[in-house]
Amino acid sequence: QKFCTLDIAPVCCQIVIGGGMYTAGNACMCEGFVSGVGRCENPKECPCTREAQIPSCCSSRWGLVSVTGKCACDCLGGTVAFPEPCPSPY
């Protein structure tokens, strides 16, 4: 559980480990990881602003991708393969 305030706005959220960004109103609304303060350069419209940050492995058209929750996986048009990060390919 992280403490946060509602005075940081906007922030750029990374919904997918390794890519996939969207702009949130503030850090408290970021479903993924805050990658920077301010709007994303290439924001992805995505309603993933209220979901708990639960790492999941998402089966998408790019293969298995680690994401921060089911909503982020849905944003990729994928389905959750299992509720933990994907195994590393290395």
UniProtKB/Swiss-Prot annotation:
Q: Which residues carry this modification: Pyrrolidone carboxylic acid?
A: Q1
Record's comment on post-translational modification: The N-terminus is blocked.
The disulfides recorded in the entry are C46-C71
User: Which keywords are on file for this protein?
Assistant: Disulfide bond, Hemagglutinin, Lectin, Pyrrolidone carboxylic acid
GO MF terms listed in the record are: carbohydrate binding
What stretch or stretches form a coiled coil here?
A: none
Q: Which domain of life is it from?
A: Eukaryota
* Role, per record: Lectin with specificity for complex N-linked glycans and O-linked glycans. Has hemagglutinating activity towards rabbit erythrocytes.
Q: What is this protein called?
A: Lectin-1
State the organism of origin: Hypnea musciformis
